[in-house]
Amino acid sequence: MPPLDITDERLTREDTGYHKGLHSRQLQMIALGGAIGTGLFLGAGGRLASAGPGLFLVYGICGIFVFLILRALGELVLHRPSSGSFVSYAREFYGEKVAFVAGWMYFLNWAMTGIVDTTAIAHYCHYWRAFQPIPQWTLALIALLVVLSMNLISVRLFGELEFWASLIKVIALVTFLIVGTVFLAGRYKIDGQETGVSLWSSHGGIVPTGLLPIVLVTSGVVFAYAAIELVGIAAGETAEPAKIMPRAINSVVLRIACFYVGSTVLLALLLPYTAYKEHVSPFVTFFSKIGIDAAGSVMNLVVLTAALSSLNAGLYSTGRILRSMAINGSGPRFTAPMSKTGVPYGGILLTAGIGLLGIILNAIKPSQAFEIVLHIAATGVIAAWATIVACQLRLHRMANAGQLQRPKFRMPLSPFSGYLTLAFLAGVLILMYFDEQHGPWMIAATVIGVPALIGGWYLVRNRVTAVAHHAIDHTKSVAVVHSADPI
């Protein structure tokens, strides 16, 4: 099956109309801030409580594979920048059927992530007494409407908002790392207890709850790294991706390792793992325990910003992905048009509409909404990352066959690192199905999702074929025929 020519109209037209409004500083901060969000600021509390201090090992291992995925994405972007990102690459290397599945799984990811973020925002607001009388679903709805309004204006404003929101998140983590290190180095007691490694020995060691909980939290940790792929989508709206992308990816990997692994180690050294609670930010717990309630409020405001930023990024990315799919016939037609400011508003509104289902979930199951949706969203993350790696492997294979030339910025140790990453992602997916509490939700989502994807493809395949043949007639290219087959 021959690939599409990267100059083919079907691959380039989906990027027409976008304003190249993102600058280098914005792209780098989007790449960094996109991966520092709700999964760390809120989710780490419950994972520390269930897995203990050894949680940092899981963050470290997952971080290695995240690095490989980012490098694979970087190689693809330098091969051909596109706002359709990995969905466009799936179309190029595997055909429209794979692009259809990858695109809708990614939409599922961000639609569910939006629910996670609005749920987290409601939890954060309930930290303050003034908001406690307000129902969780009401706060979630307000958050969704505010972020939707911001996202519909322009990509330049999106980039600026994400830059400052990401900067706030980074400053918050750096502040915690500095304050926490001072308490640790000074051997100051917190809440009447010693700090340091002695906390581990006095509370059951590095894995006090056993190895199984450490393994089971892996899916949640994977979700904490979600949104790293956002930099690939944003690359399609920057003027110099070949110059900016390698710098952004390489700098982000080291900083994420420091922030994620460093933060979880420090949290475990400052307080016993039993001090942390599900649905409560561990950073808020720390600052409250050291007797600075105002600091806890400030940190709570910061993590609230993180959730709003993640929600904003999700609406941004799905709008671009759905437009790419719509132009090629596999997405709803109303997601293809753009506003005068270069915003694909149809996909953004569709994602926000799905987010309304999360508002209902918050009203029915407020205590379980976060974890239920997180595990479903994680399947979309895994599908997106697997698609990125699979596309890089195909690019590598074709380069070896002399069909195209690989960029200089490459995934290290390819193809072996790619196969290892795919095996890791498959292992995480299996673990999610065996999760005692949330496994049934995963099974239910699969039972509903797989037939929906199959049925969806049969609904759109004739339109996909028509679009493909139109491109063949227009470009006189036979390279697109494989994507036109309605199998």
Curated annotation (Swiss-Prot):
Give the record's membrane topology: Multi-pass membrane protein
Compartment(s): Cell membrane
Q: From what superkingdom does this record's organism come?
A: Bacteria
> What is an example of a Pfam family matching this protein?
AA_permease
Q: Which UniProt keywords apply?
A: Amino-acid transport, Cell membrane, Membrane, Transmembrane, Transmembrane helix, Transport
One of the GO BP terms on file:
transmembrane transport
Ranges that cross the membrane: 26-46, 50-70, 98-118, 133-153, 163-183, 214-234, 256-276, 290-310, 341-361, 369-389, 414-434, 440-460
Q: Which GO terms describe its cellular component?
A: extracellular region; plasma membrane
InterPro entries per record: AA-permease/SLC12A_dom, Amino_acid_permease_CS
Effect of loss of the gene: Asparagine transport is partially impaired in the mutant. Knockout mutant is impaired in nitrogen incorporation from asparagine into other amino acids, such as glutamate and glutamine. Growth of the knockout strain is greatly reduced at pH 5.5 in the presence of asparagine as sole nitrogen source. Mutant is not attenuated in immune-competent mice.
Function of the molecule: Dual function in both nitrogen assimilation and in protection against acid stress during infection. Involved in asparagine uptake.
Name the family the entry cites.
Answer: Belongs to the amino acid-polyamine-organocation (APC) superfamily. Amino acid transporter (AAT) (TC 2.A.3.1) family.
What protein name is recorded for this chain?
A: L-asparagine permease 2
Gene from which this protein is expressed: ansP2
